[in-house]
Amino acid sequence: MKRIAFVLIFLVVFAFVAGDAVWRGTSNTIIRLLKGDTGEPADQMLPQDSLPAPVARFFAHTLPADRKPVRAAELTQEGEFLLNGSWTAMTAQQYITTGRPSFIWDARIRLAPLLNVYVRDTYITGHGSMRGRVAGIYPVVDAHNNAALDTGALMRYLGEAVWLP
């Protein structure tokens, strides 16, 4: 009986470790592809006299004329996520590009001690996707090839573009 319990515990731990490794590998592959294909950012900004006054002032303070355009940014986030009506701890990494508007957001949301939901949102080549798996193994969401999701992912990209002045 002890042997069966040991084997079951080993299999569960192995599945969790393998799920994490496969999930991270996929996310890292997407990031490598985005890093290699950032496209060409705009050479120059719009003339400041064509912008509304508050926007022109913002750009004057944040974007000196000799500054090169931002091509990509990597963000790390820690916080809480509203899941099933209660807030729970989460960590995330996000990689965003500007030449070809794209992002990947890879999060771990705590379900219970030692048990996370892995979530990956992407916006690449005009298409959004959302994938989530418990412990990186059991799928709980897999959404893609959806015009509403594409639109939502683009809106998120534009909303987060302030990180890339």
Q: What are these regions, as identified by a protein language model?
A:
Residues 1-16:
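N-terminal Sec-pathway targeting helices
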Residues 28, 84, 116, 145-146:
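Detector for Asparagine
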Residues 131-165:
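Flexible, processing/modification-adjacent segments and terminal tails
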Residues 47-54, 80-84, 105-109, 153-164:
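Short linear motifs at secondary-structure transitions and domain/linker junctions
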Residues 57-136:
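N-terminal mature ectodomain segment of secretory-pathway/periplasmic proteins
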Residues 14-93:
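N-terminal cleavable signal peptides for secretion/export
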